[in-house]
């Protein structure tokens, strides 16, 4: 299992491979993403820039990086908290589109029989499919992320590090 993040530019980042029984909140404390975000925010604070945060499901707890959806599980939920959850949930739809796009472009990810026939591991297939989906996103200039967030994807050269 991988901890996955979808960014406003449409790119997907997979981090921190773990055994299948590890949940995202369990994987978060040891992820390189958390360490990178803490470092980045320290750099931004040094030049007077605001911190970056990640919005996450209710299953997460809010910490110095994550802002989790408000849940009665963690205490009283006020009307303004419910309003914020409503606004943020509409933006989270874009996150689900990212993973849906990977599965749409690589339909064999949804078919256990196909994976058995070609002898591949679903995890390896998903990693490759995510890489190719990100490459395709670099060429897509009018996707839902651009429309929703106004953030263009990186060029293919930027993404592949050239």
Q: Could you describe each region identified by the protein language model?
A:
Residues 1-162:
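Short, well-ordered secondary-structure "scaffold" segments embedded in the functional core
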């Amino acid at each position: 299992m991988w901890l996955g993040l979808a960014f406003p530019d449409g790119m997907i980042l997979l981090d921190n491979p773990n055994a299948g029984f590890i949940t995202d909140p369990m994987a978060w404390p040891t992820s390189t993403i958390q360490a990178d975000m803490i470092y980045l925010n320290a750099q931004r604070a040094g030049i007077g820039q605001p911190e970056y945060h990640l919005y996450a499901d209710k299953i997460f707890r809010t910490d110095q990086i994550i802002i989790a959806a408000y849940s009665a599980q963690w205490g009283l939920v006020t009307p303004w908290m419910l309003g914020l959850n409503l606004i943020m949930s509409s933006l989270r739809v874009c996150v689900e589109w990212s993973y849906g796009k990977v599965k749409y472009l690589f339909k064999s990810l949804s078919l256990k029989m196909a994976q058995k026939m070609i002898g591949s591991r679903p995890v390896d297939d998903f990693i490759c499919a995510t890489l190719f989906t990100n490459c395709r996103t670099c060429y897509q200039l009018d996707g839902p992320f651009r429309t929703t967030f106004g953030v263009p994807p990186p060029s293919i050269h930027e993404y592949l590090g050239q």
